[in-house]
């Protein structure tokens, strides 16, 4: 029974929940992080999105079960290995998704709508759209941005269009980082195409150019936001916010260099959670925001 529960938990891929931390961004930026009610709503939103993602992971694993059995590492997944049955997977996915959308409905209608849109795009991406060149990275950026929008509606704060534009550009860049890293490793293996993705090793340079450009545009958007007179009115010492710009600029540059070296073998957001340098940069940004307040 214990092993069964462990496999059921593994099938939900809880390590991927870290991506949903973005839901807390609006809470932090609106200075409501000391409001117990807002914190509770943000935590519920995080749980709803995480369970939605887990339910979709299970559905995707059931869909790809035969392909996973032929893969050197994916064949060890709970469903591909046979440790969990298809019937178990279907039941687990239904239960998890029902709980997820029940939480979303409890929060508020706007949050529920965003979560439904997220689920539709995520499912479409997993089943087919991830094979379409460039559309795949665009959809990944949209999925990350939807987490921020969902967080905004969860805690009922005003939607910042500066934040949305910044999010689109930076997450497009990070999505391309992952693709470029895959292409680099593919080249080392003597292969030319990414299976089921539509990319070839010859796309490496153009993807790098577009991805790094998108990342640096996100820094420009951030700089314009800080320079905006309306932003200055919200802070006692807005000049300290400029500490954020070189921090993000350095981080994006570093991520791209690691990708070119083939050292970015996971989702950049997941990478950041385990990267000491990223934590130092986050601390530096936090100091800048604190001094600005």
Which role does the model predict for each range below?
Residues 1-69, 82-92:
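Topogenic membrane-insertion module of multi-pass membrane proteins
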Residues 7, 16, 20, 37-45, ...:
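Residue-level signature of transmembrane alpha-helical entry/exit and packing/kink sites
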Residues 52-80, 135, 176-184, 254:
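Acidic (Asp/Glu-rich) catalytic motifs at the cytosolic membrane interface
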Residues 19-40, 129-161:
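Long, highly hydrophobic alpha-helical transmembrane signal-anchor segments
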């Amino acid at each position: 029974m214990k092993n069964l529960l462990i496999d059921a938990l593994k099938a939900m891929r809880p390590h991927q929940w870290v991506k949903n931390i973005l839901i807390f961004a609006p809470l932090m930026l609106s200075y409501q992080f000391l409001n117990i009610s807002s914190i509770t709503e943000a935590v519920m939103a995080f749980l709803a999105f995480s369970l939605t993602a887990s339910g979709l992971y299970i559905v995707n694993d059931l869909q790809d079960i035969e392909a996973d059995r032929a893969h050197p590492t994916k064949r060890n997944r709970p469903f591909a290995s046979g440790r969990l049955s298809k019937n178990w997977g279907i039941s687990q996915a239904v239960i998890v998704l029902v709980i997820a959308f029940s939480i979303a409905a409890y929060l508020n209608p706007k949050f529920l709508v965003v979560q439904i849109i997220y689920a539709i795009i995520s499912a479409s991406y997993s089943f087919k759209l991830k094979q379409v060149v460039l559309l795949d990275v665009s959809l990944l950026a949209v999925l990350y941005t939807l987490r921020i929008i969902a967080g905004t509606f969860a805690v009922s704060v005003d939607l910042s269009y500066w934040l949305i534009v910044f999010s689109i550009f930076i997450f497009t860049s990070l999505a391309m980082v992952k693709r470029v890293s895959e292409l680099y490793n593919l080249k080392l293996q003597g292969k030319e195409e990414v299976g089921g993705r539509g990319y070839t090793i010859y796309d490496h340079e153009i993807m790098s150019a577009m991805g790094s450009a998108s990342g640096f545009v996100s820094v420009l958007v951030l700089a314009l936001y800080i320079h905006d007179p309306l932003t200055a009115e919200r802070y006692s010492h807005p000049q300290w916010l400029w500490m954020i710009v070189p921090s993000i600029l350095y981080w994006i540059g570093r991520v791209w260099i690691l990708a070119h070296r083939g050292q970015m073998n996971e989702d950049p957001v997941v990478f950041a959670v385990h990267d000491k340098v990223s934590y130092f940069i986050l601390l530096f940004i936090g100091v800048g925001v604190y001094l600005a307040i």
